[in-house]
C-alpha cells in the first residue's frame, strides 16, 4: 500500500510540474507498470517458494498438543486465582477486556499510520527536491528522441492522463471519506472512553457509598444487638421475679385451701344445735346490716348527695376488713391445734369416712351454715364451736365408737348377704338344670309328634293309592312285587349284598334314605374345592361320553347314508311314464276325545309322586 501511494503521488507530481510533457508521463506510467509487474512476480515467487513455517495455519510436527492444552489450563487457573485476589473495582468483565484490547490495537494502528505518514512526507520532499534540480531535467530532455506524434498517440496519451487523473480523484475522495470515517470513529471512541471513565468514577463513588452504608449498618446492628441483649437480660430477670411471685402466691393459696378445709372440717364436727343458732345469728346480723345500710343510704342521699358515696364505700371497706383480720388470727390458732390433733390420731380420719353422722353434718353445714365467701363479703366475725383441742379429741372418740359399732353391723350384714347369695346361686343352678331338662323333653316330644304325623300322612296316602277302586287284587300284588324287586336292586347297589337279611320294602327304603342322609352330611363336610374338582371330573366324563355317543351316531348315520347311496347306485333306473300324479284334498279328520288316556296319565303322576318323592 505504501509503494502504491508513493508511485501515485510521484506520477501526479510529475504531471502537475511538466504541464503536459508526454515523455515524462509515459516514462512514469511505464515505470509504474514495470514496478507493479515486478512486485506481482515477486509475490508469485514467494508464494511458490514460501516455507511451511510462514503459513499461519500450519503447526510444526515437534509441537505437543497435550502440552499446549495443559499450558492453557494452567494459565486459565492462574488467571482465576489472580482475579480472586483482586478487589471489586479492579476486576474486569469480558466486555471491558474486549474494549481494552480494541483500544490498544487502535493506538498501535494510529502509531503505525503516523510513522508511515512521516515516511511518505519525507519521500515526497526528496522527490520534490530531485525534480527541482535542473541538471536532472536537462539530462532527461537531452537523452529523449523527438519522434513525430500522431493524433492517435495524442488521443491515447490524453485518454491515459484522464484515466490517471480520474483514478487520483477517486482515490483522493476515498482517502477523504476514510479519513472522515476515522475521525468520526475516533470521536465516538473518545466519547465512549469519557462515558466509561464517568461510569467508572460513578461506580467507584457507588462502592464508596456502599462501604459507608455497610459500616453504618454494622454499627447500627451492633447497637441493636447490644440493646436486644440488655432487654433479654431484663426480661429474664422479670420472668424470674414473676415465677418467684407466682410460686409464693401458689404457696399462700395452698395454705389458704388447707385452712379452709380445716375450717369446714371443724364446722362439720360442730353439733347441729350450735349450727342452727349460728344460722339464726347470721340471718339477724344480715337483716340489721341491710336496715343500717338503707338508713345510711337515705341519710347520705339527703345530706351529701352523690359526693358521700366514696367515703361510705371506704368506711364500709374498712369496717369489713378489720373483723376479717381478727377472724384470720383466731382461726389460725385453732387450725394449728387441729393439725396437731389430727397428726396424733391418723386412724380417726379414716373412720370418719364411714360414719353417717359426718355426712349428715356436711349436708346440714352446706344447707344451713353459710360459706366462707359469704361471711367474708358480709364482714361478720364467725365464731367456732371448738375452743380447745380436747373438745375435738372427745368428738373423735365418740365418732370412733360409733364407727366401730357400724363396722360390726356391716360385717354381720355382709355375712348374711354372702349366705343369701350362695343359696340364690344354688337355687338358680338347680332351676336352670330343670329348665334344660324340660326343654329337651319338649323337643324330643315335638320330634316324635312330627314323625308320627309324617307316618300317618304316608299311611293315608298309601291307603288312598292302593284302595283307589280301579285296581284288582292280582294287579296290586304284581305291582308290589315289581316295586319290591326295584327297591331290592337299589338296596343292593347302595348297601351291598352282605347286609341283606329278608327286609321289607319299607325297611329297605328307610335304610337307603338313612345312608343317603349320611352321604349328604359327609358331602357337606367335604371341602368345596374337592367337590368342585369331582364335579369337573364328572362333567368331563359326561362330555366325553356324549362326544363318543355323538361320534357313534354320526358314524351310524354315515354308514346308513352310504348304504342308501350304494342301494340307489345299484338299483335299476325307473323311467317315468304318463302324467304326474296330483294330490287331492283330504276329508276332515274326526277328533276323538281321549278321556281314558288322561285318566291313565293322572294315575301315572300319582304313582310317580308316591314312589319317587
UniProtKB/Swiss-Prot annotation:
Entry coiled-coil feature ranges: 167-198, 233-260, 396-435, 504-580
Keywords: Cell projection, Cilium, Coiled coil, Cytoplasm, Cytoskeleton
Localisation per UniProt entry: Cytoplasm, Cytoskeleton, Cilium axoneme
Chain residue ranges for the region called Disordered: 36-55
InterPro entries: CFAP_domain-containing, DUF4200
Superkingdom of the organism of origin: Eukaryota
Swiss-Prot/TrEMBL GO biological process terms: cilium movement; inner dynein arm assembly
Record keyword Cytoplasm present: yes
GO cellular component: axonemal doublet microtubule; ciliary basal body; motile cilium
Main location: cytoplasm
Family from the record: Belongs to the CFAP100 family.
Function in brief: May play a role in ciliary/flagellar motility by regulating the assembly and the activity of axonemal inner dynein arm.
Family matches, as PANTHER family: CILIA- AND FLAGELLA-ASSOCIATED PROTEIN 100, COILED-COIL DOMAIN-CONTAINING PROTEIN 42 LIKE-2-LIKE-RELATED
Name of the molecule in the record: Cilia- and flagella-associated protein 100
Organism field: Mus musculus (Mouse)
Amino acid at each position: 500500500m505504501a509503494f502504491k501511494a508513493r508511485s501515485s503521488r510521484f506520477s501526479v507530481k510529475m504531471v502537475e510540474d511538466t504541464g503536459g510533457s508526454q515523455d515524462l508521463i509515459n516514462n512514469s506510467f511505464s515505470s509504474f507498470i514495470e514496478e507493479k509487474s515486478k512486485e506481482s512476480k515477486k509475490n508469485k515467487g514467494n508464494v511458490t517458494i514460501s516455507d511451511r513455517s510462514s503459513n499461519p495455519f500450519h503447526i510444526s510436527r515437534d509441537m505437543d498438543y497435550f502440552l499446549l492444552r495443559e499450558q492453557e489450563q494452567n494459565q486459565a487457573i492462574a488467571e482465576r486465582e489472580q482475579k480472586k485476589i483482586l478487589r471489586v473495582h479492579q476486576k474486569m468483565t469480558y466486555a471491558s477486556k474486549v474494549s481494552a484490547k480494541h483500544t490498544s490495537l487502535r493506538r498501535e494502528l494510529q502509531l503505525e499510520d503516523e510513522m508511515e505518514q512521516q515516511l511518505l512526507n519525507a519521500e515526497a520532499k526528496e522527490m520534490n527536491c530531485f525534480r527541482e534540480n535542473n541538471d536532472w531535467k536537462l539530462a532527461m530532455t537531452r537523452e529523449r528522441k523527438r519522434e513525430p506524434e500522431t493524433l492517435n498517440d495524442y488521443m491515447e496519451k490524453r485518454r491515459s492522463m484522464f484515466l490517471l487523473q480520474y483514478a487520483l480523484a477517486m482515490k483522493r475522495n476515498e482517502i477523504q471519506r476514510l479519513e472522515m470515517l476515522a475521525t468520526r470513529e475516533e470521536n465516538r471512541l473518545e466519547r465512549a472512553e469519557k462515558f466509561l471513565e464517568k461510569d467508572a468514577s460513578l461506580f467507584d463513588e457507588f462502592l464508596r457509598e456502599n462501604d459507608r452504608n455497610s459500616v453504618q449498618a454494622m454499627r447500627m446492628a451492633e447497637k441493636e444487638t447490644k440493646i436486644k441483649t440488655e432487654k433479654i437480660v431484663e426480661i429474664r430477670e422479670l420472668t424470674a421475679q414473676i415465677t418467684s411471685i407466682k410460686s409464693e402466691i401458689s404457696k399462700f393459696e395452698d395454705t389458704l385451701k388447707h385452712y379452709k378445709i380445716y375450717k369446714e372440717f371443724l364446722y362439720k364436727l360442730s353439733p347441729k344445735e350450735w349450727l342452727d343458732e349460728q344460722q339464726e345469728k347470721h340471718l339477724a346480723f344480715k337483716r340489721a346490716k341491710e336496715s343500717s345500710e338503707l338508713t345510711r343510704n337515705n341519710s347520705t342521699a339527703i345530706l351529701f348527695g352523690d359526693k358521700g358515696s366514696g367515703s361510705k364505700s371506704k368506711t364500709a371497706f374498712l369496717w369489713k376488713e378489720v373483723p376479717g383480720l381478727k377472724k384470720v388470727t383466731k382461726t389460725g390458732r385453732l387450725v394449728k391445734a387441729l393439725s396437731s390433733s389430727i397428726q396424733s390420731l391418723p386412724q380417726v380420719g379414716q373412720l370418719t369416712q364411714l360414719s353417717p353422722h359426718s355426712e349428715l353434718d356436711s349436708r346440714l353445714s352446706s344447707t344451713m351454715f353459710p360459706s366462707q365467701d359469704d361471711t367474708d363479703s358480709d364482714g361478720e366475725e364467725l365464731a367456732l364451736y371448738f375452743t380447745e383441742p380436747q373438745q375435738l379429741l372427745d368428738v373423735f372418740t365418740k365418732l370412733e365408737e360409733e364407727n366401730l359399732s357400724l363396722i360390726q353391723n356391716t360385717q354381720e350384714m355382709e355375712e348374711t348377704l354372702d349366705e343369701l347369695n350362695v343359696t340364690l346361686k344354688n337355687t338358680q343352678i338347680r332351676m336352670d338344670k330343670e329348665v334344660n331338662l324340660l326343654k329337651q323333653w319338649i323337643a324330643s316330644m315335638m320330634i316324635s309328634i312330627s314323625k308320627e304325623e309324617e307316618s300317618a300322612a304316608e299311611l293315608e296316602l298309601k291307603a288312598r293309592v292302593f284302595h283307589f277302586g280301579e285296581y284288582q287284587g292280582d294287579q296290586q300284588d304284581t305291582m308290589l312285587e315289581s316295586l319290591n324287586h326295584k327297591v331290592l336292586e337299589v338296596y343292593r347297589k347302595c348297601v351291598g349284598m352282605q347286609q341283606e337279611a329278608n327286609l321289607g320294602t319299607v325297611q329297605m327304603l328307610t335304610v337307603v334314605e338313612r345312608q343317603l342322609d349320611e352321604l349328604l352330611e359327609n358331602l357337606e363336610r367335604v371341602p368345596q374345592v374337592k367337590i368342585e374338582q369331582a364335579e369337573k371330573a364328572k362333567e368331563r366324563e359326561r362330555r366325553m361320553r356324549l362326544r363318543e355317543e355323538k361320534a357313534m351316531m354320526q358314524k351310524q348315520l354315515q354308514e346308513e347314508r352310504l348304504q342308501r347311496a350304494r342301494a340307489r347306485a345299484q338299483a335299476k333306473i325307473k323311467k317315468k311314464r304318463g302324467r304326474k300324479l296330483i294330490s287331492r284334498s283330504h276329508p276332515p279328520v274326526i277328533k276323538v276325545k281321549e278321556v281314558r288316556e288322561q285318566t291313565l296319565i293322572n294315575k301315572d303322576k300319582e304313582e310317580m309322586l308316591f314312589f319317587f318323592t
